[in-house]
């Protein structure tokens, strides 16, 4: 999640985003999602990914090659309790269909070693972004989910989320085919467990989230599968130390084994309740379509 560090500069940032090229109707993203791009005419490689932020996040090396000038608005990207700090500047970026101006963020640590930067569907100029994950198969269903940004001052710079109803309240869903496991923040896991009968099991593992930062994760199994569009599943990972806690919030009639915690607490900060659908579940899906004018994400899965 991107957070600003200078709220007073927000109005200036909005003014700097004028002059973008007329958007094309649709962009198709397939394969590894990596495309040749330029920033201020300087070449690099950027990955367009469903879970990427609208503000391109690139390496300091690329920003320096492009002689980007940092503005007064810095940012930080929260990965659990850790933060990656960066700088921003406005420059023309070309993803292969013509240049447009965009505020660009850069960090010393790369978001991914696979490319010089990443960008999400909210940051490309096309109205519709179609991610092709694999060849369609018989029996697939397409379900449209409403979408939202992360909200707050940096809402227009962050990720685009799908929304589902969980216990009468919205739960934010992101789609990340570049990470193996489906993961929930601790507060999201608490809500899911309360609604679906969840139990934490097994040992803590370290899982890379972004920027090479690893966070502790345990496995949760559900008595009643969770539905996200055409997907149903009963197993997911829980980021036990991130945005909430799974410790000390159990509510069960029977004694609780230390390695099996029944989580029933409700989150007090719903904005931090996020579920990231990983490659383990997206392997069932052939495409994800972000339709920005319709404010929909359409997920097609078997």
Description of each model-found segment:
Residues 1-11:
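Bacterial N-terminal signal peptides that target proteins for export
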Residues 22-302:
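Pepsin/retropepsin-fold aspartyl endopeptidases
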Residues 12-21:
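Hydrophobic h-region of N-terminal signal peptides that target proteins for export
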């Amino acid at each position: 999640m991107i957070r600003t560090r200078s709220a007073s500069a927000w109005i200036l940032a909005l003014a700097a985003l004028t002059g973008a090229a007329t958007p094309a109707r649709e962009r198709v993203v397939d394969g590894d999602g990596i495309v040749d791009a330029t920033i201020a005419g300087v070449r690099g490689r950027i990955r367009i990914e469903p879970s990427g932020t609208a503000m391109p996040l690139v390496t300091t090396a690329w920003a320096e090659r492009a002689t980007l000038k940092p503005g007064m608005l810095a940012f930080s990207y929260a990965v659990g309790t850790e933060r990656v700090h960066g700088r921003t500047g406005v420059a023309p970026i070309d993803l292969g269909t013509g240049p447009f101006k965009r505020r660009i963020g850069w960090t010393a640590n790369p978001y991914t070693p696979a490319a010089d930067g990443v960008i999400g569907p909210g940051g490309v100029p096309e109205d519709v972004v179609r991610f092709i994950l694999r060849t369609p198969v018989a029996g697939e269903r397409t379900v449209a989910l409403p979408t939202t940004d992360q909200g707050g001052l940096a809402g227009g710079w962050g990720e685009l989320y799908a929304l589902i109803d969980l216990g009468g309240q919205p739960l934010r869903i992101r789609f990340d085919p570049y990470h193996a496991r489906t993961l929930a923040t601790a507060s999201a896991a608490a809500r899911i467990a309360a609604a679906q009968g969840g139990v934490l099991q097994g040992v803590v593992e370290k899982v890379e989230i972004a920027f090479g930062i690893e966070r502790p994760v345990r496995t949760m199994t559900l008595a009643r599968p969770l539905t996200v569009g055409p997907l149903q599943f009963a197993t997911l990972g829980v980021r036990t130390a991130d945005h909430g806690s799974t410790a000390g919030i159990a509510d069960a009639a029977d004694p609780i084994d230390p390695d099996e915690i029944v989580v029933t607490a409700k989150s007090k900060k719903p904005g931090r309740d996020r579920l990231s659908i990983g490659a383990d579940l997206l392997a069932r899906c052939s495409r994800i379509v972000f339709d920005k004018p319709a404010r929909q994400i359409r997920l097609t899965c078997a």
